[in-house]
Amino acid sequence: MSFIKNLLFGGVKTSEDPTGLTGNGASNTNDSNKGSEPVVAGNFFPRTLSKFNGHDDEKIFIAIRGKVYDCTRGRQFYGPSGPYTNFAGHDASRGLALNSFDLDVIKDWDQPIDPLDDLTKEQIDALDEWQEHFENKYPCIGTLIPEPGVNV
């Protein structure tokens, strides 16, 4: 009984409930809730990241300078038919630095991770601004790392 009393009167933080039984009263199977489900932070290989493109999986992850951001709530920009859809499931660093949305600036999952060491100061500044935008708007959920034997 004390659990219910604490729940109703503030003793339990519902955001920390591992059972998923508390919350805003919405069902956990509600499709509108899928984009807000928490994602466990971790390491992503480019191959793994490529699955989170809004097509193969509802979630949309984008990497910038080795950090992976959950951009699912920006689906209108990064999802299918969005203006930045080419970045979904990829390392978008070079494309953002060059202000280019062409596929030829995005590496495939089986290519080495782009070191970005040939960018000009202006391109680095542009990438800095984009990264700040992502850091302020989307949760960082992990790190992009090379897959042994693949991205080397």
Swiss-Prot record:
GO terms for biological process: regulation of ergosterol biosynthetic process. Residues 24-35 have a biased composition (Polar residues). InterPro entries: Cyt_B5-like_heme/steroid-bd, Cyt_B5-like_heme/steroid_sf, MAPR/NEUFC/NENF-like. SMART domains: Cyt-b5 (SM01117). Residues 18-37 are annotated as: Disordered. GO terms for molecular function: heme binding. One of its GO terms (cellular component) is endosome. Residues 46-145 form the Cytochrome b5 heme-binding domain. It holds the Pfam family Cyt-b5. It comes from the Eukaryota. Present with 6300 molecules/cell in log phase SD medium. Belongs to the cytochrome b5 family. MAPR subfamily. PANTHER family: CALCUTTA CUP-RELATED, MEMBRANE-ASSOCIATED PROGESTERONE RECEPTOR COMPONENT-RELATED. The cytochrome b5 heme-binding domain lacks the conserved iron-binding His residues at positions 81 and 105. This is Damage response protein 1. It comes from Saccharomyces cerevisiae (strain ATCC 204508 / S288c) (Baker's yeast). The gene is DAP1.
